[in-house]
Amino acid sequence: MQINKAALEIFDFTSSLAVYSEHELKIGEQDIHDYIAGHVTKAFKDPGARTGTLHAHSPMGKRIGEYKSGEISFITLAKELGEKTFDYMKQATVGVVIDTIVCDVVTDTNYICMLLCQAHDAFTHQLFSEDDGSLSTELVPHKAVLPMPTQKLRAFIAINTLDLSVRIFEPKGEYDGEVCYILADKVLQLGTDQSSRDTVKKVKTIIDKVAQAHESDGVAELTMAKSMIAKNAEVSDTVNPIRIVEEVFKSNPIQQEAAKKELAEQDMMRPLPVNREFATKVGEHHKIKTDTGIEISFPVEYMQNREFIEIKTNDDGTLRIELKNINKIVNK
């Protein structure tokens, strides 16, 4: 990843004060470059990110075009994006300091990214020399420490400067009494698809709901769905919920139609974007919990192989779980 340019802006919502830099960050310094690159890399993989596309004639779409053509500078673009963000957020955000990094990034293509880093309190050590020449150490508080790249950003925007496609994650906020996504709905004026996490969660919920409504525990259906999602991620960055429910309920047309009705109500009757790394992890394990408090986690593919695990119904209607071919048990 290459960071071409970056600018830092300070949003202090404790005092409703914003500071916009008139100079770029010194990204030639390796530590600064690596800090920004680390956050951007992690944010691109976030399964909570939603996707959409800016209209070329929208206010932000036009400014991105003007930046590409050299009509406006990077600092001008960063400041305008920052000012618009602060103006909308100040009504919905209180009591925090957010340092915002706007950067020009190249990965597979060129992006304008905005990283909202919520500051937090932290402590470090400091060495003091006493009057008698002895040394002492103290804990020193810092009131505005930024999150490390291993920690999640408060919000993130990545705008592809070629096709104006957008990846974005943010918490919901309230503006003029309306609960909304401030960055997507107000700053960018952008409609988005649901996130990978929401897509997978809704597919699983629908399959489980339909299965249990037709006197099944849903375990076999859910493990099949998770396996399909994971295998699909090997070749595609979209998932088709219709194909999944058709395959899971292929022997039961009534359940199939019930699941499709649920998908239609959730506006999921079409292929939806999905983070391939996240989708692959979804298919690794399945976890079940009994009404007696026992929890079991097992590889998804084991449900297709009765040599390892099998769920049976007893004569009295209760269930039993058989774990087979075990050579060793390890306490954890």
Give the location of each predicted region:
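Long, hydrophobic alpha/beta structural blocks
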Residues: Q2-V282
